[in-house]
UniProtKB/Swiss-Prot annotation:
GO terms for molecular function: alkane 1-monooxygenase activity; metal ion binding. GO terms for cellular component: plasma membrane. Pathway: Hydrocarbon metabolism; alkane degradation. GO terms for biological process: alkane catabolic process; lipid metabolic process. This is Alkane 1-monooxygenase. It catalyses: octane + 2 reduced [rubredoxin] + O2 + 2 H(+) = 2 oxidized [rubredoxin] + octan-1-ol + H2O. It is an enzyme of class 1 (oxidoreductase). The lineage of its organism: Bacteria, Pseudomonadati, Pseudomonadota, Gammaproteobacteria, Pseudomonadales. Catalyzes the hydroxylation of n-alkanes in the presence of a NADH-rubredoxin reductase and rubredoxin. Fe cation 2 binds at H173, H312, H315, H316. Keywords: Cell inner membrane, Cell membrane, Iron, Membrane, Metal-binding, Monooxygenase, Oxidoreductase, Transmembrane, Transmembrane helix. It comes from Pseudomonas putida (Arthrobacter siderocapsulatus). CDD domains: Alkane-hydroxylase. Its cofactor is Fe(3+).
Amino acid sequence: MNGKSSVLDSAPEYVDKKKYFWILSTFWPATPMIGIWLANETGWGIFYGLVLAVWYGVLPLLDAMFGEDFNNPPEEVVEKLEKERYYRVLTYLTVPMHYAALIVSAWWVGTQSMSWFEIVALALSLGIVNGLALNTGHELGHKKEAFDRWMAKIVLAVVGYGHFFIEHNKGHHRDVATPMDPATSRMGENIYKFSTREIPGAFRRAWGLEEQRLSRRGQSVWSFDNEILQPMVITVVLYTLLLAFFGPKMLVFLPIQMAFGWWQLTSANYIEHYGLLREKMADGRYEHQKPHHSWNSNHIVSNLVLFHLQRHSDHHAHPTRSYQSLRDFPGLPALPTGYPGAFLMAMIPQWFRSVMDPKVVNWANGDLSKIQIEDSMRAEYIKKFTHNVGADDKRGATAVAS
């Protein structure tokens, strides 16, 4: 027996108390179908908006009730935990769940008599869960195995965001918490303005990265080896079939659910690194990203439906680490609630800023020069925050203004 095996065999017995609760992440995409069933059984069309109520209302309340979990798996059991097949299988099973939600919802809209209000409510509900197909693709796309990476492309095709596979792994993880990253929001930048640079910026960066990769291999960017075109083709075929089978209502239903799915990623990107900035070194490069360059959340319930996405700090420190092994660290910048509640706050900019701006300033120890700030808000922030900091911090704030 080699030394490595001995270490694994002698690892302390660890019990993941959440092990069988992770199945909530797998079944979360089925929620729109539950809404359809309830609407059909009761005759109340309001149930088509079930996911909206659960996501923006019920989950934040449950997060507040059940609180946070700061427990970590011991480092010596992480390798063994990573190899446990159960956790990976749950992510695989989530992929067909996303397809089922899309196809069943499209079938229902195409074959039933529904008001436009009901169609939009169901489209938005589907958009939330299929927006979180991006989360499933995120978990699978960081893996090294070819099967996992193809599963990521397949699930990203559900919501027509196949370029995320390239953009996130090769772009966002490289540039996060710097001015070069369109997926890092600035303090004072509202989510609506952020979306206008994040959505097109993400696609441009992904396309450029893939063009460079293929060029190095002597291939055209229009080659089918283009990993952006692969899921894009799946999306086109899938949506064309849905249109052919379920009729012209799909011309409204599919774009709405897709747009709201994209909005979920925009919301996540907006809150995950809001205002945070890596320090620029003497050679002009930015410091290596660290766990404190991401906003973290240990809220139990929302983490259980998001494959631990909210332990975002450790994810950026160890991108290939699976969800069940992600850790919390002392002193991390922390969101006041889980992602559903934070997404809701973000849609009301004054509310979000009133909660998060002081947190960002505290994160920077009052030095505004260490924060990414929206240009139009600089003067306001200098006036608002410099009276609470010392002379050294005021010099930092002055440096920001210059």
